[in-house]
C-alpha cells in the first residue's frame, strides 16, 4: 500500500503489534519484518492500541515498568510511533456495563455474560477503551464540565496533573523519550541495523551518517 505519494499511500497503520507478546523475540520479528517490507525510504508504524481494541497496557497487567520498555521501543524503533490517547499516563480499560454502552457492538453482545466473555476473550463493548481522558482529579477528571457518556476508567489515580509533578512518572518518561528522539538524527531519521536478541534482551542500532545510537531493551523480570 505504500508508494511515492502518487500511486499509493505515504504512511499506513501496521497492526502487527496490537496483540503483542511481551518478549524480545516477538518484537525482534516485527522489527525485522518492518525492514523487509518497509525498508527506506518507506516508513513503518509501531502501534500498540486504538479505539477498537482493549487498552494495550492490559496485556502487561497494567505494569508501568513494562509499559516503559514498550514506550522506549516505540520511540527508538525506525518509523513513526503512534500512541493512543491515555497510553502516556497508563490509562486502563473502563468497566462499562453492556446495558449502558453507546457502542453498537455492545447491542450485538448484550446476551453474552461477562464471565463467559472474559473466558473467550470477547470484547463486549469498545466503550471500555474509550473512557474520558484523565487530565486531573477534578469532577469528570477535567475532561468535561458535563457528565460524559462513559465513566472514568479503572485507574482514576493516573492523571496528567498528578504525573506532571512526578519526575519518575510514565508521562515524564514519555516526554524524555520524545526529547531524546527529537535531538538525535539517528533516532528520528536513521536506518535500523543489527536487530537481534540475546535471551530476553532485544537490541538494535539506529544509524544516520556518522551518528549511531545503540538500543538495548530488557524484557526480563530481572534488572540489567
Question: What positions do the PLM features span?
Answer:
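Loop/helix patches that line or flank the sugar-binding groove of alpha-linked glycan CAZymes
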Residues: 2-3, 8-12, 22, 30-33, ...
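Active-site-adjacent loop/helix micro-motif of nuclease/hydrolase catalytic cores
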Residues: 26
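Catalytic-domain carbohydrate-binding cleft regions of carbohydrate-active enzymes
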Residues: 44
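Extended redox/cofactor-interaction regions of prokaryotic respiratory oxidoreductases
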Residues: 14-16
Amino acid at each position: 500500500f505504500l508508494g511515492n505519494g502518487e500511486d499509493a499511500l505515504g504512511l499506513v497503520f501496521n497492526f502487527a503489534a496490537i496483540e503483542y507478546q511481551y518478549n524480545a523475540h516477538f518484537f525482534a520479528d516485527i522489527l525485522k519484518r518492518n525492514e523487509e517490507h518497509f525498508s527506506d525510504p518507506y516508513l513503518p508504524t509501531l502501534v500498540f492500541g486504538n479505539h477498537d481494541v482493549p487498552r494495550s497496557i492490559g496485556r502487561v497487567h497494567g505494569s508501568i515498568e513494562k509499559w516503559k520498555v514498550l514506550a522506549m521501543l516505540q520511540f527508538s524503533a525506525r518509523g513513526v510511533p503512534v500512541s493512543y490517547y491515555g497510553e502516556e499516563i497508563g490509562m486502563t480499560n473502563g468497566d462499562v456495563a453492556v446495558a449502558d454502552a453507546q457502542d453498537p457492538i455492545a447491542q450485538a453482545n448484550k446476551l453474552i455474560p461477562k464471565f463467559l466473555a472474559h473466558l473467550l476473550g470477547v470484547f463486549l463493548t469498545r466503550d471500555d477503551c474509550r473512557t474520558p481522558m484523565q487530565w486531573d482529579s477534578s469532577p469528570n477528571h477535567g475532561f468535561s464540565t458535563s457528565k460524559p457518556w462513559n465513566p472514568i476508567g479503572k485507574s482514576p489515580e493516573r492523571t496528567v496533573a498528578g504525573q506532571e509533578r512526578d519526575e519518575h512518572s510514565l508521562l515524564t518518561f514519555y516526554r524524555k523519550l520524545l526529547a531524546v528522539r527529537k535531538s538525535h538524527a539517528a533516532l528520528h531519521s536513521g536506518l535500523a541495523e543489527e536487530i537481534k536478541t540475546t535471551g530476553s534482551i532485544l537490541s538494535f542500532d539506529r544509524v544516520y551518517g556518522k551518528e549511531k545510537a545503540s538500543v538495548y531493551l530488557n524484557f526480563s523480570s530481572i534488572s540489567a
